[in-house]
UniProtKB/Swiss-Prot annotation:
The organism's taxonomic lineage, starting at the top: Bacteria, Bacillati, Cyanobacteriota, Cyanophyceae, Nostocales
Name of the featured protein: Pyruvate-flavodoxin oxidoreductase
Manner of cofactor binding, per the entry note: Binds 3 [4Fe-4S] clusters per subunit.
Entry-linked PROSITE patterns: 4FE4S_FER_1, 4FE4S_FER_2
Gene: nifJ
GO biological process, one term: response to oxidative stress
Species name: Trichormus variabilis (strain ATCC 29413 / PCC 7937) (Anabaena variabilis)
Alphabetized InterPro entries for the sequence: 4Fe4S_Fe-S-bd (IPR017896), 4Fe4S_Fe_S_CS (IPR017900), PFOR_II (IPR033412), Pyruvate:ferred/Flavod_OxRd (IPR050722), Pyrv-flavodox_OxR_EKR_sf (IPR037112), Pyrv-flavodox_OxRtase_EKR (IPR019456), Pyrv/ketoisovalerate_OxRed_cat (IPR019752), Pyrv_Fd/Flavodoxin_OxRdtase_N (IPR002880)
Binding residues annotated for [4Fe-4S] cluster 1, in chain numbering: C696, C699, C702, C762
Length: 1190
């Protein structure tokens, strides 16, 4: 056996390394958690890396997974070795083509990071729902249980498909395998070449469509032959299992790693056996070893080839002593007599068991949406099998108090050996903790003889969410595919987490605790929450503290504390000699940040060099009794709330205790209340804006740009200040319309993310201190309590009357209450200010169809939602369908609302003699064109409802009841279709185009970040020429799609292109005009993004630079102007005055290319400048045309 190379990589990279080498065409589209496989392929192709045949694979990005499947089908039909990667809904979009590919016996492998399907809710996490939905397509299914298996099966499945002609799904668990980092043995180029015989490749090519040997495929067949034709493939499927095992045996001869279609592990005379597939196999494997060492007789069968299901080999793998079988499925099929694997096992046993009585077979569900699957749960399943009457169709890992399917288990059951080092790190999204820990586990895996495993837990929030890193390393193979619950090392990178989460729950006696503290060493002990003090003393922990933010700030890295904490970990863990560890950290810094420029590299290295001087051991008191220091609890704390209440449910989720919620606690249809984000109080900002009353000019700009709606302004009567807190600030209102009133700008300190955009846009200058403005950043912690009281008081002040505000004046319009607040978006997000503005203007009558993407995640991800309500209980109604159908989904809203309004109007006419003709006429004739008319209409509807409720005439009651149920539709509803550029320009463009052509009164808001932000920054058709993005590693060669111009060609669509940072009044005007327009409206909003490689605190300057250079145009196309004899296109940008280079190179996404490939960067910049010039000239021409009517 040849010497082997090891690498510490995650499952996605492990698969991509193989797939890239043995394919010629790779069609891609981003979807979590499979995207990194496509990203690696694109990056290698961009570098010119060849495959085993010496050619660089063609990597082509499509507009959707449906498009990918079509491209794959076409490439396969013309003889190329072709593959793709996907998951979840993406895989479902491929199903029609999968039937075709399989029906034509075309070899290919789709590599799937298996993920939940959107049902009552979307979930990005892992289970087998997606792959099980494809069972009827004819694709074979090969399942990998670990990173090593995923690496190996990528090669094995490709060989099998070429030999069998059966297309394959090679799948592995999303996140648990796709994103787990593990030390694996790598296959080599020689392995690939030896394992993929040329004759199989030639045979595939010989079946290609070519005019040199013309044939016809894809015919339409009639009833006389279709049935028979379907049966012709049977011999291929019957042969597939034998071919698969033969290939696995050959692989074993080459590598020493033997796989079986059904691999048994356990006692040879086992009486109880669990059958499953995927990463759960590893947990069962190690639990079987533990239980058998205690004298049990148990085993596990790991299913590798699921389809075609070889019943004979399955029976042969079972010990003949088997008396009880538990089949575990990682999916749910409501209404079925059992889940898929269970049904196949039952069928196989019934058909093939032979002599003697059948074993008892029970089925169960586990692990949906990456729900934990632990040794304690495995033991519970074995215990259930040992019961006199085992529970069938059970669930494990949840508390089902509705259908009573769940098994009880011991959550503290632990089987991990003491010689495995286990460490947990609690970080904040975007503080670099996860990235640093990925590098740490790679250093350990590659620079020591240890096996290593890294797994990272984060919710779907953007930066600012909690991340938990789980690192294991030791001298033996690590099979523990579950979270650590006994850690020898715990690091807390955010002080506030001490009050929010059970940070020290899983640390062992005598363990090491590393804490990032904002306080000096001498203050730390007194500042610790009482519960933490008690745990430190009771568990006799060694505690080390560092002010990582101070070290990072002094190194010029602001909030990026990852490098600092990484150095501390290596210094305390002793896994490597200290100097060697620091050298490796610096090596990985250069590798990780080299493309971002030497300045970033040097800042990180400076942080490394200064860290250990700031790391101190904390001297704790002798233990006597738990200190009586009150703990902080969330306003939505589960303590004190009834178990059935929404506050209790959301409180448990916020406290990271959602796993404890029973089935009965959750809504059965996925419906949740709005207005809950205000209870979360994340306290993640190190600094918050503080208002200077003397300098402020009361322009409202800071309020408008605040991405999280934490800055608010109000005017009010002076007497409202009578009970104000002593630190509450106010000033005399400066607007002439508010003479004699008081004015306040207030910040929600505990909801602020500290982005600083408000400071950047503030136009006011402090003449005494030129570096100061009317709003300035100051440390949050000393201000928190006072600002909490000030915020509560501010909310008690009545809002200004919306009917009296001048909505075209920003300072007045920003007095409107936002009905979108405190989202989980990135600090400094460029999308949310537009959404917030829409809710301020129209939120109390708004219904929103939101495409899957960033805006659906920060807008609709549990536990809390930023969409909220006003004091009257009105606010945006929000829903997300899918990524690809959002435009159609929103059109459905409009069609339905219009129909219900029509029915209500008809009923109103029919009941006019009863409710009063005058009231009916007033309701039906009200145009509802402004706030005053909307308010009047609501008052009339209230009177109407009172009259309807008073009716007692039996003949009228049914109509009255119907009208009562529809009366609110007589108030104008504002339908908004919201999504990002990945939706609008790519996957959803067909539907969007149809809605634009419909003429229906919907408002479409495209939050254009110019990349697929939600999936990690991949290229879309909105990505500008020359930008480096994932899937465009060598810089995007094509120009940005002009969505606005395409929409204008219909002639009856209102179109606006806006950039708040360039011209906020223009943005406001566009929103008002779009909503007022009676047809279809489209607003394309420039939205800066963290993926642009910019400082988000000054991102509004980037927007302005984009407009000043002509890269982004401001315009409004208003069809109604044609009726007035005017040109409908109003070009609101001025002639570009900034060279494009100066705008582009403010952003790292453009600047990176100058380092990667300077010549290409120079050429693309030249082309992009030409494109900008030509586009400006075209829009100038279009806006200057004279319009003639009729």
């Amino acid at each position: 056996m040849k010497n082997r190379t090891f690498a510490t990589i995650d499952g996605n990279e492990a698969v991509a390394q193989v797939v890239y080498q043995i394919n010629e065409v790779i069609a891609i589209y981003p979807i979590t958690p499979s995207s990194p496989m496509a990203e690696w392929s694109d990056a290698w192709a961009s570098e010119g890396k060849p495959n085993i045949w010496g050619t660089v694979p063609t990597v082509v990005q499509m507009q959707s997974e449906g498009g990918v499947a079509g491209a794959v089908h076409g490439a396969l039909q013309t003889g190329s070795l072709t593959t793709t990667f996907t998951a979840s809904q993406g895989l479902l979009l491929m199903i029609p083509n999968m039937y075709k590919i399989a029906g034509e016996l075309t070899p290919t492998v789709f590599h799937i990071a298996a993920r939940s399907l959107a049902a009552q809710a979307l979930s990005i996490f892992g289970d087998h729902s997606d792959v099980m939905a494809t069972r009827g397509t004819g694709f074979a299914m090969l399942c990998a249980a670990s990173v090593q298996e995923a690496h190996d099966f990528a090669l094995i499945s490709t060989r099998i498909t070429l030999e069998s002609r059966i297309p394959f799904l090679h799948f592995f668990d999303g996140f648990r395998t796709s994103h787990e980092i593990n030390k694996i043995e790598l296959l080599t180029t020689e392995d690939f070449k030896g394992f993929i015989p040329n004759e199989l490749v030639i045979a595939h090519r010989s079946r290609a469509l070519t005019p040199d040997k013309p044939v016809l495929r894809g015919t339409a067949q009639n009833p006389d032959v279709y049935f028979q034709a379907r049966e012709t493939v049977n011999p291929y499927y019957l042969a597939c299992p034998e071919i698969t095992q033969k290939v696995m045996d050959e692989f074993a001869q080459m590598t020493g790693r033997q796989y079986q279609l059904f691999e048994y592990h356990g006692d040879p005379t086992a009486e109880r056996v669990i059958i499953l597939m995927g990463s759960g196999c590893e947990t069962v494997h190690e639990t079987v070893d533990y239980l058998n060492a205690l004298g049990e007789k148990v085993g596990v069968i790991k299913v590798r080839l699921y389809q075609p299901f070889d019943s004979q080999r399955f029976i042969a793998a079972l010990p003949t002593t088997t008396r009880g079988i538990a089949v575990l499925d990682r999916t749910k099929e409501p209404g079925a007599s059992g889940e898929p694997l269970y049904l196949d096992v039952v069928t196989a046993l019934y058909e093939k068991w032979g002599v003697g009585s059948l074993p008892t077979v029970i089925g169960g569900r586990y692990g949906l949406s990456s729900k934990e699957f632990t040794p304690g749960m495995v033991k519970a399943v074995f215990d259930n099998l040992a019961a006199t009457i085992p529970k069938n169709h059970f669930t494990i890992g949840i508390n089902d108090d509705v259908s009573h399917t769940s098994l009880d288990y011991d959550p503290d059951f632990n089987i991990e050996p003491d010689n495995i080092v286990r460490a947990i790190f609690y970080g904040l999204g975007a503080d670099g903790t996860v990235g640093a820990n990925k590098n740490s586990i790679k250093i350990i895996g590659e620079e020591t003889n240890n096996y290593a495993q890294g797994y990272f837990v984060y919710d779907s929030k953007k930066s600012g969410s909690v991340t938990v890193s789980h690192l294991r390393f030791g001298s033996q193979l690590i099979r523990s595919t579950y979270l650590i619950n006994k850690a020898s090392f715990v690091a807390c990178h955010q002080w506030d987490f001490l009050e929010k989460f059970p940070i020290l729950k899983d640390i062992v006696q005598g363990g090491t605790f590393l804490l990032n503290s904002p306080y000096d060493q001498d203050e730390v002990w007194e500042r610790l929450p009482g519960k933490i003090q008690a745990q430190i003393q009771q568990k006799q922990l060694k505690v080390y503290v560092i002010n990582a933010y101070k070290v990072a700030r002094e190194a010029g890295m602001a909030g990026r504390i990852n490098t600092v904490m990484q150095v501390c970990f290596f210094a305390l863990s002793n896994v490597l000699p200290r100097e060697e560890a620091i050298a490796e950290i610096k090596k990985y810094i250069r590798k990780t940040y080299g493309k971002k420029g030497d300045q970033i590299v040097q800042m990180n290295i400076k942080a490394v060099d200064t860290t250990l001087d700031n790391l101190h051991e904390l001297v704790t008191r002798e233990y006597s009794a738990p200190p009586q220091i009150p703990n902080h609890h969330y306003p939505l704390s589960p303590e004190g709330a009834p178990p059935s209440s929404i506050p209790y449910i959301l409180g448990k989720m916020i406290a990271r205790e959602g796993d404890e919620l029973p089935v009965s606690a959750l809504p059965n249809d996925g419906t949740y209340p709005t207005g809950t984000a205000k209870w979360e109080k994340r306290n993640i900002a190190q600094e918050i804006p503080v208002w200077d009353t003397d300098v402020c000019i009361q322009c409202g700009k800071c309020v408008m740009v605040c991405p999280h709606s934490v800055i608010r302004s109000k005017v009010y009567e002076p007497e409202q200040l009578e009970n104000a807190p002593s630190t509450f600030k106010s000033a005399n209102a400066k607007d002439h319309d508010w003479h004699g009133l008081k004015f306040t700008i207030q910040v929600a300190a505990e909801d602020c993310t500290g982005c600083g955009i408000c400071v950047d846009v503030c136009p006011a200058k402090n003449k005494a201190q030129p570096r100061k403005k009317a709003i300035n950043m100051e440390p949050q912690l000393p201000l928190r309590q006072a600002e909490r009281e000030n915020w509560d008081f501010f909310l008690s002040i009545p809002n200004p009357d919306r009917r009296e505000l001048k909505l075209t004046h920003i300072n007045q319009q920003q007095m409107q209450e936002p009905l979108f607040e405190f989202s989980g978006a990135c600090a400094g997000c460029g999308e949310t200010p537009y959404i917030k503005l829409g809710t301020q203007l129209f939120g109390d009558r708004m219904i929103v169809a939101n495409a899957t993407g960033c805006s659906s995640i920060y807008g609709g991800n549990l536990p809390t939602t930023p969409w909220t309500q006003n004091a009257a209980g009105r606010g945006p109604a929000w829903s997300n369908s899918l990524f690809e159908d959002n435009a159609e989904f929103g059109l459905g809203f409009r069609v339905s609302i219009d129909k219900q309004t029509e029915i209500a109007s008809q009923l109103l006419q029919e009941l006019a003699t009863v409710v009063g003709r005058e009231l009916v006429d007033d309701i039906l004739n009200n145009q509802q064109n402004n706030e005053a008319e909307i308010w009047e209409q609501r008052d009339r509807i209230s009177i109407l409802k009172q009259k309807l409720q008073a009716l007692v005439n039996p003949e009228l009651t049914s109509k009255a009841q119907l009208l009562l149920s529809l009366a609110d539709y007589l108030v104008k509803k504002s339908v908004w279709i919201i999504g990002g550029d990945g939706w609008a320009y790519d996957i959803g463009y067909g539907g969007l185009d149809h809605v634009l052509a419909s003429g229906r009164n919907v408002n479409i808001l495209v939050l254009d970040t110019e990349v697929y932000s939600n999936t990690g920054g991949q290229m879309s058709k909105a990505t500008p020429k020359g930008a480096v993005a994932k899937f465009a590693s060598g810089g995007k060669p094509a120009a940005k799609k002009d969505l606005g111009l395409m929409a204008m060609t219909y002639g009856n669509v209102y179109v606006a292109s806006v950039a708040m940072g360039a011209k906020d009044e223009h943005t406001l005007k566009a929103f008002l005009e779009a909503e007022a327009y009676s047809g279809t409206s489209l607003i394309i909003a420039y939205s800066h993004c963290i993926a642009h490689g910019i400082n988000l605190s000054t991102a509004m300057q980037n927007q302005k630079a984009a407009v000043d250079s002509g890269r982004w145009l401001l315009y409004r196309y208003h069809p109604d102007l044609v009726k007035q004899g005017k040109n409908p296109l109003q070009l609101d940008s001025r002639t570009p005055k900034l060279p494009l280079e100066e705008s582009m190179y403010l952003e790292n996404r453009f600047k990176m290319l100058t380092k990667i490939n300077p010549e290409v960067a120079k050429e693309l910049l030249k082309e992009a400048q030409t494109d900008v010039n030509l586009r400006w000239q075209m829009y100038q021409y279009l806006a200057a045309r004279e319009v003639t009517q009729g």
